[in-house]
Each structure stands twice: as structure tokens, then as C-alpha cells.
UniProtKB/Swiss-Prot annotation:
Alphabetized InterPro entries for the sequence: Ribosomal_bL28 (IPR026569), Ribosomal_bL28/bL31-like_sf (IPR034704), Ribosomal_bL28_bact-type (IPR001383), Ribosomal_bL28_sf (IPR037147)
One GO term of the biological process aspect: translation
Domain of life: Bacteria
GO CC, any one term: cytosolic large ribosomal subunit
Region spans: Disordered: 1-20
PANTHER family hit by this protein: 39S RIBOSOMAL PROTEIN L28, MITOCHONDRIAL (PTHR13528), LARGE RIBOSOMAL SUBUNIT PROTEIN BL28M (PTHR13528:SF2)
Natural source organism: Photobacterium profundum (strain SS9)
Protein name (database record): Large ribosomal subunit protein bL28
The keyword Ribonucleoprotein is annotated on this UniProt entry: yes
Gene for this chain: rpmB
């Protein structure tokens, strides 16, 4: 399973670890992914999503029905 948020599309980015001597070694910054079940009242079922904490806040703000509609327009299977 790829480390991509289903709502926001956030994915890992690369950068550097920096030691005290400012030596650089490559590293990955991973998104804060959580697996969460949401109850969709209009469909009378649970939907399981892999999303970031920010994605959960977006669902709290807009509502699960609107977010699922936006995901389906993008071609995401839900």
C-alpha cells in the first residue's frame, strides 16, 4: 500500500538529516497517515480510508459526503 493520503494526495517528500556538524544524509519525510472508518449516512455503510490527520480535519469541516463526491470525480474508488 502506497503512503499517499486518499483525501489530500499528500505523499512522502525527501530532504536531509542534519548532524550537529551540518553533515547531510538523505531521508524521507512521511505523511501522518491513519486508517479510519467513517459512517456514510447516505449510503448506510462504513467507508475505510487511509488519510492524514489534515484529511480528517477536512472531513470534519466539509462532511464525508462532499469529500467522497470529490474523490469519485478524481477517479478514486471508494
Amino acid at each position: 500500500m502506497s503512503r499517499v493520503c486518499q483525501v489530500t494526495g499528500k505523499r512522502p517528500v525527501t530532504g536531509n538529516n542534519r548532524s550537529h556538524a551540518r553533515n547531510a544524509t538523505k531521508r524521507r519525510f512521511l505523511p501522518n497517515l491513519q486508517t479510519h472508518r467513517f459512517w456514510v449516512e447516505s449510503e448506510k455503510r462504513f467507508v475505510k480510508l487511509r488519510l492524514t490527520a489534515k484529511g480528517m480535519r477536512i472531513i470534519d469541516k466539509k462532511g464525508i459526503d462532499i469529500v467522497l463526491a470529490e474523490m469519485r470525480v478524481r477517479g478514486e474508488s471508494v
